[in-house]
């Protein structure tokens, strides 16, 4: 009886772990006796430099109220704390402090764990949109909680140089920075050192990026000549040497030199110039690939499909995969699945060239409310899948598809739907203060009817948000203006009811304003329409936006807006379906068909359709809508 009471109490306080079903990332070896629990009274950290544990690996043992965390380095101890925190219900803001654990109920357990890749990073662009120190520290807490170990800090871009400069203080002068882009805001050397030290205490290495010679409009405006000119290189040498004098190599062993999206007369000479300065400063250089030609000692960061095709066996240098990792592109719902299923560097674990990956967040468009940066771009949900694949290794799941949810019955489908349960758990228990705009949706089935060049194509898709361009590509063609796609799914309910669902027909990238904008008053964006019909009475009801648009027909740009005035117009919540109030969807008892009509109005880089049932909570957060049953597409089943 005493044992039963102990179990009941432990479940009431915090659910114990039966294997590794709730941990992100999942440990490679966890043994737990869930029938034995105890109250934590003491945490002991053991850094054993002569033990056999690899860098960042850790072990956890628990017994009689004491938890012992063992590692060969500080990073391993931090990772152990993160795992323990998830076991007992301590969040990202608290897990570095012992007091948060004392008194928590834990299972008797033994864990041994290590990462598959040595680089598991997150890049934030603060050159285009400045971010306060307090917000960066909070980000670092989140990264450490999910065992990321690199913060790639993009410190300069076209709008501004965000680093204190003593030699050339005019670089910090607001008059030379882009208007509206946080003029006059930059990081002092004291602040940079403080962020690096804060990160190091959490097992994170900071890689500052000074983008050269491209992405540097501020430089031309400040000095009247370009970075790649003879005068510009002289200025740059002084700036780089000052930075390395202020930020010593033990704090900053790597410096990213950018180098992409620019054309200059002597690319080899410029890159050798930069690499020589970095090397003489005792650092290792990183550069984007493709970009200007770099030496074999420089680490390449893959950012495009061209780079992905070139990397792999035979690539001449070490490299980091960011190809699939742009939070600001595409749709956050689709991205979250992509990041989980993507195999970093096309290998299961690191080798002498493949180092891992860095998840990137670029906001080319001006950001007015910095608290919206993460929810607008699908963070932290995108981080969760990336954390699993970068720590646990790329499994190369059968049935994984780029930009499309995997089909029912595939290995990828089973893995993703299982991982979604973890994501929901973390959203509800650790990430309530992060405005995570995501619910499990991979199992939503669709019958897809495509009208293409006077032909009708019937296929299927899965997931609450469907990339229509990807559907067309998978069927062997590129959609043209005038084509139409209809998505249909069926939902069964026991009684007449009204559910709420996110509905959307556009997913503008946060790096450009290319989209059809906000819909006409009373209509959905991008010409989309939604209908609900009940099998029992064959009546059809059209569903309209839940409330009037604040800015109907605004922000319609059918071309990319990089470096143009529209990119200075901040995005608002009503332009992203995952940020909006859910629509009311009346359902009748029995089977109800949901149909999304999606016309191709222009050749958009993003073309999505979404229908995602959600439950709006009283605190503003969201969760899954329960009690719904979906049918399979008719191409698979008659019901």
Where are these regions (language model features)?
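Bacterial Sec-dependent N-terminal signal peptides
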Residues: 1-22, 639
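Acidic, contiguous N-terminal accessory segments
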Residues: 6, 18-112, 287-289, 296-298, ...
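Feature activates predominantly on carbohydrate-active enzymes
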Residues: 22, 55-252, 557, 563-564, ...
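Active-site neighborhood of glycoside hydrolase catalytic domains
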Residues: 219-299, 303-314
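Flexible, acidic glycine-rich loops studded with aromatic residues
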Residues: 305-444
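Extended carbohydrate-recognition surfaces in non-catalytic/accessory domains of CAZymes
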Residues: 429-495, 552-564, 572-577, 633-638
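Aromatic-lined ligand-binding clefts that engage carbohydrates, nucleic acids, or primary amines
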Residues: 490-533, 594
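An acidic-aromatic loop/edge-strand motif
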Residues: 545, 555-638
């Amino acid at each position: 009886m005493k044992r039963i009471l102990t179990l009941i109490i432990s479940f009431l306080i915090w659910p114990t772990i039966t294997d590794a079903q709730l941990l992100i990332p999942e440990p490679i070896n966890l043994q737990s006796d869930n029938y034995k629990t105890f109250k934590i009274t003491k945490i002991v950290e053991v850094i054993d430099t002569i033990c056999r544990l690899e860098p960042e690996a850790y072990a956890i043992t628990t017994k009689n109220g004491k938890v012992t965390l063992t590692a060969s380095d500080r990073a391993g101890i931090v990772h152990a704390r993160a795992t323990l925190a998830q076991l007992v219900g301590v969040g990202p803001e608290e897990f570095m402090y012992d007091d948060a654990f004392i008194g928590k109920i834990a299972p008797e357990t033994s864990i041994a764990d290590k990462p598959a890749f040595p680089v598991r990073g997150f890049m934030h662009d603060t050159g285009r949109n400045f971010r306060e120190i307090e917000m960066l520290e909070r980000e670092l807490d989140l990264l450490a909680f999910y065992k990321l170990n690199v913060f790639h800090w993009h410190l300069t871009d076209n709008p501004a140089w965000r680093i204190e400069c003593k030699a050339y203080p005019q670089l910090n002068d607001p008059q030379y920075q882009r208007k509206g882009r946080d003029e006059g805001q930059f990081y002092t050397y004291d602040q940079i050192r403080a962020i690096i030290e804060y990160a190091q205490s959490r097992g994170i290495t900071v890689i500052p990026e000074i983008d050269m010679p491209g992405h540097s409009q501020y430089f031309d405006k400040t000095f009247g000549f370009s970075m790649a000119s003879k005068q510009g290189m002289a200025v740059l040498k002084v700036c780089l040497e000052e930075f390395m004098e202020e930020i010593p190599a033990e704090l900053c062993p790597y410096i990213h030199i950018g180098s992409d999206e620019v054309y200059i007369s002597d690319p080899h000479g410029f890159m050798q110039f930069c690499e020589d300065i970095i090397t003489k400063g005792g650092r290792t250089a990183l550069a984007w690939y493709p970009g200007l030609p770099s030496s074999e000692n420089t680490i390449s960061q893959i950012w495009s499909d061209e780079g992905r095709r070139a990397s792999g066996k035979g690539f001449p240098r070490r490299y980091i995969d960011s190809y699939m990792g742009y939070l600001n592109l595409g749709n956050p719902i689709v991205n979250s699945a992509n990041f989980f299923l993507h195999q970093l560097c096309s290998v299961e674990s690191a080798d002498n060239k493949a180092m891992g990956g860095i998840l990137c967040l670029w906001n080319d468009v001006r950001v007015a409310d910095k608290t919206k940066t993460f929810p607008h771009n699908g963070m932290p949900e995108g981080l969760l899948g990336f954390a699993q694949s970068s720590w646990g290794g790329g499994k190369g799941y059968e049935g994984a598809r780029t930009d499309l949810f995997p089909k029912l019955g595939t290995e990828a489908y089973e893995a993703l739907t299982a991982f979604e349960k973890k994501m929901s758990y973390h959203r509800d228990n650790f990430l309530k203060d992060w405005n995570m705009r995501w619910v499990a949706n991979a199992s939503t089935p669709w019958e897809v009817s495509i009208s293409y060049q006077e032909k009708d194509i019937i296929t299927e898709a899965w997931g609450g948000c469907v990339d229509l361009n990807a559907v067309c590509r998978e069927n062997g063609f590129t959609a043209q203006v005038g084509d139409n796609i209809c998505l249909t799914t069926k939902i069964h309910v026991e009684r007449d009811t009204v559910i709420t669902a996110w509905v959307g027909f556009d997913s503008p990238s946060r790096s450009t304003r290319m989209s059809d904008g906000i819909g006409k008053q009373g209509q959905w964006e991008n010409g989309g329409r939604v209908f609900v019909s009940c099998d029992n009475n064959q009546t059809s009801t059209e569903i309209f936006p839940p409330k009037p648009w604040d800015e109907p027909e605004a922000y319609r740009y059918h071309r990319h807006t990089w470096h143009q005035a529209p990119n200075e117009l901040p995005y608002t919540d009503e332009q992203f379906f995952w940020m909006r109030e859910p629509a009311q969807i009346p359902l009748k008892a029995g089977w109800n068909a949901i149909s999304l009509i999606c016309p191709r109005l222009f050749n958009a880089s993003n073309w999505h359709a979404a229908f995602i049932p959600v439950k709006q909570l009283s605190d503003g957060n969201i969760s899954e809508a329960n009690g719904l049953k979906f049918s399979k597409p008719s191409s698979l089943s008659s019901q």
